[in-house]
């Protein structure tokens, strides 16, 4: 199973100097970006350490990670709306903070 974040950032190179302008905060371990979405129901947490990007979606009602976004078998209008909103966040980060890595291996 491929995670959505891995698909979005495949063959992309992160440009560190663009991260702060986008809203990432520098931390001891790297960079972190947090943003609420879907009217504050969810929190996207994106981290970058050693040029590797990782992300999680937290359901703010329960405080639990909303893992359903990465399970293709999970379908329905609600989970699809969460996926779409999260993908929009990831796509914006990729567009504004990365460049294409033309010769990267898959």
Language model feature labels by segment:
Residues 1-2, 7-9:
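A short, structure-level motif marking secondary-structure boundaries and short turns
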